[in-house]
Amino acid sequence: MPRRREVPKRDVLPDPKFGSVELTKFMNALMVDGKKSVDERIVYGALEQTAKKVQGKEAIEVFNEAIDNAKPIVEVKSRRVGGANYQVPVEVRPSRRLALAMRWVRDAARKRGEKSMDLRLADELIDAAEGRGGAMKKREEVHRMAEANKAFSHFRF
């Protein structure tokens, strides 16, 4: 247990356009070198593209659906027992779930081949909302690892 005092969580303000705290957190995760204005332009541009491509749904709905679909339920953690390292499956805390989903969507969007980042992000959000794409692939991979190491789940933390 840490001996220092617990650091308080900082509240994140909702974004001005959609009023979503999750969207602000995603913007902060996407930000490079503290350039928030560039980041906002990318995210809002991506959401506009998403609204054009997906008919009958709001862009923020697609974003929320994409993040929810990408959230992992279980992951593996290394645990050393008697000189051997075991990959022990553990349930993911809700705050970490959100952070991992956002990170995976961001990384998958960066790896895509489209011309600009807002197009990449828009397509990745649409793919994740529909249950495919790089972020979903990463989630399935993590779940497969946990399933494969289910035998070591009695080595709980």
Swiss-Prot record:
Membrane-spanning ranges = none
What domain of life is recorded for the organism? Answer: Bacteria
- Record Pfam families: Ribosomal_S7
Q: Which GO terms describe its biological process?
A: translation
Which GO cellular component terms, listed alphabetically, does the Swiss-Prot or TrEMBL entry include?
Answer: small ribosomal subunit
Q: Which UniProt keywords apply?
A: Ribonucleoprotein, Ribosomal protein, RNA-binding, rRNA-binding, tRNA-binding
Q: Does the keyword Glycoprotein apply?
A: no
The protein's matches in InterPro entries, at most eight in alphabetical order, are given as:
Ribosomal_uS7, Ribosomal_uS7_bac/org-type, Ribosomal_uS7_CS, Ribosomal_uS7_dom, Ribosomal_uS7_dom_sf
**One GO MF term, please?**
tRNA binding
Subunit field text: Part of the 30S ribosomal subunit. Contacts proteins S9 and S11.
Name the NCBIfam families for this protein. Answer: rpsG_bact
The family this protein is said to belong to = Belongs to the universal ribosomal protein uS7 family.
Q: What does this protein do?
A: One of the primary rRNA binding proteins, it binds directly to 16S rRNA where it nucleates assembly of the head domain of the 30S subunit. Is located at the subunit interface close to the decoding center, probably blocks exit of the E-site tRNA.
List, alphabetically, the HAMAP family matched: Ribosomal_uS7_B
Concerning PANTHER family, the annotation shows: RIBOSOMAL PROTEIN S7
Protein name (database record): Small ribosomal subunit protein uS7
Q: Which species is this UniProt entry from? A: Eikenella corrodens
**What's the name of its gene?**
rpsG
